[in-house]
Amino acid sequence: MRQGRKERSIDELYGDPERADAVIFGRRTGVSRRGFLEGAGLAAMGAAVGASIPFAGNIPAGLVPAVFAQDKPAEGKPSEPQNLVLPGKDPNLIVVGDKPLNAETPAELLGDDVTPVEAFFIRNHGGIPDAPAEPDKWVLKIDGEVERPLDIPLGELKTKFPVQERPMVLECAGNGRAFFIPPARGNQWTTGAVGCAVWKGVRLADVLKAAGLKSSAVYTANSGADPHLSGDPSRQTLSRGTPVAKAMDENTLLAWEMNGKPLIAPHGAPLRLVVPGWVGSCSHKWLNRITIRDKVHDGQGMGGFSYRVPVKPIVPGSKGDEADTRILETMPVRSVIMGPANGARLAAGTRAIALKGAAWSSDKGIREVEVSSNFGVTWEKAKLAPPRGPYDWSRWTATLKLPSDGYYEIWARATDNAGATQPFIAGNWNPQGYGANVYHRIAVLVG
C-alpha cells in the first residue's frame, strides 16, 4: 500500500490484513497469528460488530468480521440493481452483474433437500432467449464424429429414450471468487453461485449411442441459443464441451424439467445439459447442438484463461502464463450454512444455536462437516444425512453451545471422502478466480 494513500472500502483496506487490524482496531499480532485485542481496540471491534465478543482472543490476524465479509458481493455501479427483478425469480437474489445478468442466492434461501427454482442462482454469458411457444418442437442436432447424425425434436426425445430423474448440484466455477486476495477478475460471487435441483431428462449417453460414436470421438462441442450481447448473430456466446467419457457418464442428462416443472427461460428452457460435478458452464442452457469432435474442443470459453487454472501455483495478483494452464473440470469440496442467516440476532439469554446446511464435492462425497463458534480453536462434528445420489449434496445439522450474550462467528468446513478439507484462506489464487472454497462463516448476535 502506498504511503499516505487512503483506502476507499473495507475490502481495499483489508488488502493488507495486518495493517487493517492496526488501523481499525489497534491490534497487535504475535507469532501465533492470532491477534491481541485490548482496551480501545477491543471496544472498537465490539462497536463495529454491535456487541461484545466472547472469544475475542481467538480472532485470527487480519480477519474481516463475517458480518461485513460473507454473503455480501461488492456493490455495483449506482445504476445497477442490487436485488433481482425478473419474473419467476426471488427478488432477494443478489445481482452480481447485469450485462450479462448474473445473480446469486443468499445462503439462507438455498433450501434443504433442493433449491427452489425461484431461488436458484442465475449464470449467463449472453442474453436470455424467450422460451419457445411450442417446446416439444425444439430440435437438438447431434453431428460431427458420429455414424448417424440426428435432428431430434424435444417431444421425440421425451418418448424415445428412458427418462431419468436425479438430484444433482450445479455450481459456477467462480463461486467464492469474492474471497480471493487480491481480487480476481469476474463476477464477485460469494457463496451463492450454487444450487441443488431434481433434474428430469434422458441420459446424453443414450442419445449418443443412438447416433453411433465413431472411434475418433474425443470431445463434445456444445452450443445454445443464447444471443451474444453485441447483438451480432454471427458471434457465439459460449461453446464449451467435455471429454466423451464424461458425456457418456450415466448422470449426464439432457434435461427439460427442474424440480418437477418445465424449465423456465433463465434456466435454459426448453432443454439444457446437466453435467454434474463439473463446472456449471459445462451444463449448457438453451441447448440446440452437440458436435462430436476428434480433438479437445476449442470453442468460445475454452481458450485463454477461460475456465482454466494454472498447472502450478502462481504469485497472487500476477498475470500468469496461458501456456501453463489446464482446463478446470471439477469443483473442490465446499460447505454452506443455510440457517441461521448471516447477521441473525438471537434473543438475550440464548445459550445454544441450531445450525443447518449442506456440503458437496463433485462426485467424491462428504466424509464430515465440522462447525466452530470460537474462531476455529475447537470444532464439533455435524450430523450428516445420507445423500440421495452421487451428485446430491449432503445435508447436515448441528447444535453449538454459547457461553454468553455477544457477537459470535459460526464457521463451517467440510472434508470429502478423498481427504480434502476446505481451507481458511483461498490459497489457489488464479487470474479468473476459480475454485475459492474457504470456510463458510456467518455472524450471529445474541442479546
Show which residues each predicted segment covers.
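Structured, non-membrane catalytic/scaffold regions adjacent to prosthetic-group chemistry
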Residues: D71-G447
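Short, intrinsically disordered, low-complexity terminal segments
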Residues: P17-R19, M45, N58, A66, ...
